């Protein structure tokens, strides 16, 4: 199972580099077409007000990637990464994409993840490769 990921500060890139999974990095400069099943790993950068929360512009490449040639149709699940100290906007971008495209949110981790997070994502990818149904593994 391929991982498609976006990294702003390098934390998501560091996480993905610890896995033994094929991957592609989403770039604001390239149009990437996915013709195979993949998992999306995305950080969250959002703003929160009393009436609305939304992802900020730095996350536009992820939204553009998912829309490009209907890449979202090949996405089997979304994994969110962030910082729990941000409370209501923790993994917000992953939740927003999950709702927009009706793609399951399968896992979340903080920063560049732990060895247990790496193992869990590799296990999810293996299960999905075998056609298994998986559900969200971490409490929000």
Swiss-Prot record:
Domain of life: Bacteria
Entries under InterPro entries matching the protein: Flavoprotein-like_sf, RNR_Ib_NrdI_bac, RNR_NrdI
A Pfam family hit: Flavodoxin_NdrI
Molecular function terms, GO-annotated: FMN binding
GO aspect biological process, one term: protein modification process
Family from the record: Belongs to the NrdI family.
HAMAP family linked: NrdI (MF_00128)
Entry function: Probably involved in ribonucleotide reductase function.
Full protein name: Protein NrdI
Provenance organism: Lactococcus lactis subsp. lactis (strain IL1403) (Streptococcus lactis)
